[in-house]
Amino acid sequence: MSERTGLVTRKTRETEVNVTLNLDGTGVYWVHTGMPFFDHMLQTFSKHSLFDLELTAQGDLAVDGHHTVEDAGVCLGQAIKKALGDKNGINRFGHAIVPMDDALTMAAVDLSGRGLLVFDAAMPSPRVGDFDTELVEEFFRALAVNGEFNLHIRLLAGSNTHHIIESIFKAVACSLKEAAGMSGGTGIPSTKDTL
């Protein structure tokens, strides 16, 4: 099997983001975005997906974190798409229900070639430290649209915003790990013979 890796660089007037991803990794990460809480969530994503991830971002944080978080999602989504290649032999679908203390999140993925986010998770607090919690949805929308996969996220329980966000990142990581995993079969998992 050839390496399933993706390398993406994006430079705009607002941000510069570099991503290197290995789908068949061990969860090794090196992340620096200038936003410590977001770094922690991306590290959590890498650890629980077992995707090796190097992600660096420099953005206009003096304005706010929106551009940095969204562009990180754009680049990570594109890296996932590149690493999946023609999707021959993948599971295609993945889902997980993940607790984090009081929080419980369901995530489901279809690596269908169609980018869509359905996000049903209200945040009790507008901020966790310096991190704007409405950016969680923006990150996952950019990830799903640019990765060209369906992603459903539903919060089932939770009152602590940090725990809610962490359970979301872990649930998505576990879902993508399953969906991107190799089924042991051959061929494209679609009656269309393409994804």
Swiss-Prot record:
Top-level division of the source organism's lineage: Bacteria
Organism: Pelotomaculum thermopropionicum (strain DSM 13744 / JCM 10971 / SI)
Chemical reaction(s) catalysed: D-erythro-1-(imidazol-4-yl)glycerol 3-phosphate = 3-(imidazol-4-yl)-2-oxopropyl phosphate + H2O
Keywords: Amino-acid biosynthesis, Cytoplasm, Histidine biosynthesis, Lyase
UniProt similarity note: Belongs to the imidazoleglycerol-phosphate dehydratase family.
Record bears the keyword NAD: no
Entry's EC annotation: 4.2.1.19
Primary site of residence: cytoplasm
Top enzyme category: lyase
Residue ranges the record marks as coiled coil: none
Subcellular location: Cytoplasm
Transmembrane segments: none
Disulfide bonds: none
Gene: hisB
Protein's UniProt name: Imidazoleglycerol-phosphate dehydratase
Xref: SUPFAM superfamilies: Ribosomal protein S5 domain 2-like
One Gene Ontology term from the biological process aspect of the record: L-histidine biosynthetic process
GO molecular function, one term: imidazoleglycerol-phosphate dehydratase activity
One Gene Ontology cellular component annotation held by this UniProt entry: cytoplasm
Signal sequence interval, chain numbering: none
Protein's pathway: Amino-acid biosynthesis; L-histidine biosynthesis; L-histidine from 5-phospho-alpha-D-ribose 1-diphosphate: step 6/9
